[in-house]
Every structure is written in structure tokens, then in C-alpha cells.
């Protein structure tokens, strides 16, 4: 039996990176997945990958900063599976430009980071909790925070939004514990092919990308970059019953970065 047999899961940002890797792992462990992404074609590709391995998934377009979209995604899970068991609020966007300092950010940059990284998690938590309570309690929420929300390392605006995610995680965990609802977060360190590439590195030639990956990995005591698959393994554990007495945890997936 899989760790998530019979479970229904929503994964936001399922079209790439941690969201795609986690969707595949959740499906391998027996969950039925609603793959939500603002880029529908990317979500559909994740569904194809899930189905290729014998899993079950559907794709839904979703802007996590839009409350109606978030409600619709959860409704889809209930319609498809009869209930919601797992809500993985994974969507996040990086700082808009590599190396951007505080004074380099526009108000529009701030608003975009806050809308997606912070409001999106708030909405996902809010409506998952509403659904879990309708079902009589229980259920699991997992958020993607960041070590940037745990320590100061530059990227002030991004770090502020991720610090907010971390505090939402702890607050909702305490509020919802009496209802048997668990809430945790994974806090990855820098992942070169998600954070850095999304902020402009995709324009770099392949050899430069490899150099970026090596540089990022060298900042972690274990000496290698963090991958989407690393995060997916942590996610599977935290949403499974093996973590049934774990809530309010901010789990660094960071190669030892925070411990330095």
C-alpha cells in the first residue's frame, strides 16, 4: 500500500518544479491529484506524466491570488474525489531580477510577490480549512515557505513574503489543531533551476546554468544544490499519516544551510 492510498490532494504550481515533482510522488503513493497551475498546458503535462505511471490526476487553471479560482480548485477535488484530504500551497515566485536590492523593487514588484507568495497561501489555507471542517475535521495543509523566511540572506521583499508564509503556517496549525487539521511547511534553500532561472537565468547558456548550480550548491554544507525531488520527498512524509503527530513545523530542505 502507498502512503497516500485513497487520498485526494490539490497541488498548486503543479506545472513545474516542486509542484510537478510532488504531484508525481503523491500519485506514486496512491493519491488522486488536482494539478493546479496558472499555465494550464503545464498542468496538463504533469497530468500526462502522472497517468503514464498509472496515477490519476486532473488539470485545472488557477491564479492563486484570485479567491474564486482557489475555491474552484478545491471544489474540483471534492467533485472528482468526494472530499479533500491534502492541500499543498506550493506556488511562489522569486524576486523579479537576479541580485535586486530593496531599492530596485517597484511597488508593482512588491504587490506581485505579496499577492502570489502570501495572499495565495492565505487563500489556500482559508478555503482548505473551510472544506476540512465541512467534512468533520482532519486533513492536511502543506505550504512552501523558504529558508529566506527563516534567516536573513538578502532578497528582502521575497524573504518578507516567505516569512509571512512561515507564520501563517504556525498560526493556522495552532488554530486548527482542535479540529485534527495538521499544517506544516517545507522551507527549501535556493534551487538553481527554479528560483534563479525564473528570475532571469533561463537566458543563460547551458554551461552558465551549470556554473550557477555549482555555485548555489557550494553554499550548502552538504555541498550540492537542492532539487525539486528533495522537496517532494519531504512533502510526501509531511502529508502522510507517518507525520500524524507533526504540526506547525517549518522543515528546512536546505543541505544544512540554516544550521550553519
Segments from the language model and where they lie:
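Active-site helix of classical SDR
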Residues: 125, 161, 169
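A glycine/serine/threonine-rich, flexible loop-to-helix segment
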Residues: 178, 190-219, 230
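Catalytic Tyr-X3-Lys loop
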Residues: 103-122, 142, 165
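C-terminal substrate-recognition "lid" of short-chain dehydrogenase/reductases
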Residues: 122, 222-253, 258
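Substrate-binding pocket helix/loop in short-chain dehydrogenase/reductase
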Residues: 98-102, 106-111, 202, 212, ...
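Residue(s) in the substrate-gating loop at a strand-loop-helix junction
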Residues: 146
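Short, small/polar-rich loop/turn modules that mediate ligand/substrate recognition or access, typified
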Residues: 177, 182, 246-248
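Amphipathic alpha-helical dimer-interface segment in Rossmann-like NAD(P)H-dependent oxidoreductases
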Residues: 116-135, 173-174, 178, 240
Amino acid at each position: 500500500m502507498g502512503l497516500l492510498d485513497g487520498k485526494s490532494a490539490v497541488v498548486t504550481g503543479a506545472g513545474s518544479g516542486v509542484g510537478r515533482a510532488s504531484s508525481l510522488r503523491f500519485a506514486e503513493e496512491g493519491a488522486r491529484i488536482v494539478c493546479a497551475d496558472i499555465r494550464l498546458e503545464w498542468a496538463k503535462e504533469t497530468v500526462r506524466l502522472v497517468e503514464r505511471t498509472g496515477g490519476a490526476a486532473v488539470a485545472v487553471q488557477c491564479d492563486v491570488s484570485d479567491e474564486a479560482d482557489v475555491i474552484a480548485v478545491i471544489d474540483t477535488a471534492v467533485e472528482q474525489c468526494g472530499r479533500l484530504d491534502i492541500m499543498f500551497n506550493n506556488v511562489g515566485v522569486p524576486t523579479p531580477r537576479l541580485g535586486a536590492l530593496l531599492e530596485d523593487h517597484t511597488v508593482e514588484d512588491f504587490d506581485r510577490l505579496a499577492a502570489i507568495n502570501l495572499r495565495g497561501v492565505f487563500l489556500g489555507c482559508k478555503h482548505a480549512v473551510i472544506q476540512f471542517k465541512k467534512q468533520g475535521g482532519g486533513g492536511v495543509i502543506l505550504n512552501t515557505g523558504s529558508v529566506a523566511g527563516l534567516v536573513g540572506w538578502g532578497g528582502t521583499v521575497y524573504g518578507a513574503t516567505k516569512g509571512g508564509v512561515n507564520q501563517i503556517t504556525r498560526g493556522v496549525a495552532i488554530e486548527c489543531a482542535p479540529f485534527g487539521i495538521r499544517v506544516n511547511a517545507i522551507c527549501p534553500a535556493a534551487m538553481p533551476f527554479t528560483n534563479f532561472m525564473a528570475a532571469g537565468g533561463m537566458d543563460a547558456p547551458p554551461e552558465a546554468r551549470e556554473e550557477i548550480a555549482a555555485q548555489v550548491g557550494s553554499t550548502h554544507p552538504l555541498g550540492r544544490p537542492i532539487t525539486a525531488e528533495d522537496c517532494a520527498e519531504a512533502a510526501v512524509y509531511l502529508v502522510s499519516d507517518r507525520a500524524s503527530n507533526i504540526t506547525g513545523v517549518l522543515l528546512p530542505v536546505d543541505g544544512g544551510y540554516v544550521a550553519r
